């Protein structure tokens, strides 16, 4: 009987050890940029994920979910069919609409419908009881919500033609995403994100090219709110 117990314990330990890498090969990444389209291309939307450490590319079966201002799901989550190739630390993953692919000349790693509602909403990587990461904005009202804290630009939302980007300065640096010991994620969207010119990037390392007919410029600032607007000649 003692031998059986030892054997059972060894099997259990082996299963735990083999499961450990699988539990850590996709979730150490964060949402770093969100774009909700512009006046001429309202469906040109995208979300950029970024890996904090190497080896976070096993995305098959994992998903991105979208929510309206009341916290209700919009459509069904978009699901990765498999892993992405580049697993280096700081690698990006692009989830985008076909309109965004065309506008920025970039191939998405996962195609999404235009589910982002600029006035208010939330999106999560791995939505569920314990999402990996979320961002909320505007008049999102399903509060309190520990996954987003205070929405980004509450009452204003995502400015047309502007992207919002995670502030990487919380850990003391400005160019490297940290989400382990030093952390660029405070779980408060108002604190974590700032407006920026759209600059999507995909897992292949390509960056979006802004259409020459689009001019992005800083348009307004009011208190903590600000944004970029778009002029299409």
What is the predicted function of each stretch?
Residues 21-71, 212:
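A structural motif detector for short, solvent-exposed N-terminal "entry" segments of globular domains
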Residues 71-78, 129-134:
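Surface-exposed loop/edge segments in extracytoplasmic proteins
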Residues 77-103:
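Intrinsically disordered, low-complexity Pro/Gly/Ser/Thr-rich segments with frequent PxxP/GP/PP motifs
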Residues 30, 46-50, 65-67, 94-96, ...:
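Residues within well-ordered beta-strands of beta-sheet-rich folds
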Residues 9-18:
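Bacterial N-terminal signal peptides
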Residues 213-226:
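Extracellular carbohydrate-recognition regions
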Residues 1-10:
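Bacterial N-terminal signal peptides that target proteins for export
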Residues 60-61, 109-203:
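Conserved beta-structured recognition patch
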């Amino acid at each position: 009987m003692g031998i059986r117990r030892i054997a059972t314990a060894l099997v259990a330990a082996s299963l735990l050890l083999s499961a450990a890498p699988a539990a850590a090969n996709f979730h150490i990444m964060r949402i770093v940029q969100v774009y909700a389209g512009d006046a001429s291309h309202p469906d040109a939307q995208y979300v950029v994920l970024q890996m904090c450490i190497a080896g976070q590319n096993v995305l098959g079966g994992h998903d991105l979910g979208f929510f309206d201002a009341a916290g209700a799901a919009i459509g069904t989550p978009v699901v990765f069919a498999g892993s992405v190739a580049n697993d280096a630390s700081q690698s990006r993953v692009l989830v985008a609409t076909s309109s965004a692919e065309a506008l920025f000349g970039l191939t998405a790693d996962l195609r999404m419908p235009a589910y982002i509602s600029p006035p208010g909403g939330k999106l999560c990587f791995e939505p569920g009881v314990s999402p990996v990461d979320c961002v909320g904005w505007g008049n999102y009202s399903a509060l309190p919500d520990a996954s987003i804290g205070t929405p980004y630009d509450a009452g204003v939302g995502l400015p047309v033609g502007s992207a919002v980007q995670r502030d990487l300065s919380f850990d003391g640096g400005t160019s490297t995403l940290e989400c382990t010991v030093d952390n660029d994620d405070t779980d408060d969207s108002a604190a974590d994100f700032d407006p920026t010119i759209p600059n999507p990037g995909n897992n292949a390392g390509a960056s979006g090219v802004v259409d020459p007919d689009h001019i992005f410029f800083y348009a307004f600032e009011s208190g903590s709110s600000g944004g970029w607007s778009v002029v299409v000649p």
